A protein has these predicted regions:
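Surface-exposed, low-hydrophobicity beta-strand/loop segments enriched in small/polar/acidic residues
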Residues: 2-142
Length: 142
């Protein structure tokens, strides 16, 4: 059996000028942005911008999605203008969704660069949607 350390734990234990932890990885302040949208025949391909504009350097920890059954064959993905599925690939919303947090590995801990990734976007696919969508964005800033 081995005792090993994660990459950031190693940097924490032996900090140098070349391996300093970036902002928010240890001791950052967790922030929460809660938002909702009441869809009324929202058309396929529409986007819903949620939460506040994220600052350069913020790290997205998770994005939680809950919604009513929005309509036959509908889906929602969670991302931004740079990647529509950065935080969650299309999840079926034909039935109600309760607290979906299936964030892909590349999206967990994603550092906002300030290019096209400062606003969280939900993208509707598969058909028109009617119902309530609720989103909670957890992110870290220094």
């Amino acid at each position: 059996m081995s005792a090993v350390y994660g990459a950031n734990r190693t940097k924490y234990l032996d900090p140098t000028t070349t391996n300093t932890l970036s902002r928010g990885l240890f001791g950052g302040k967790l922030r929460v942005a809660v938002d909702s949208y009441e869809a009324s025949t929202l058309t396929n391909g529409s986007t819903i911008a949620v939460g506040q504009t994220l600052a350069i350097g913020d790290k997205v920890v998770a994005v939680l999605l809950s919604c009513d059954a929005l309509g036959t064959s509908t889906t929602l993905s969670i991302g931004d203008a740079g990647s529509a599925t950065r935080y969650q690939a299309a999840v079926s919303t034909q039935s109600a969704v309760a607290g979906s947090i299936a964030i892909p590995a590349d999206g967990m801990g994603y550092t906002v660069t300030g290019t096209d990734d400062t606003i969280i976007l939900l993208t509707l696919g598969g058909g028109n949607a009617t119902g309530t969508v609720k989103v909670t964005v957890l992110y870290v800033k220094e």
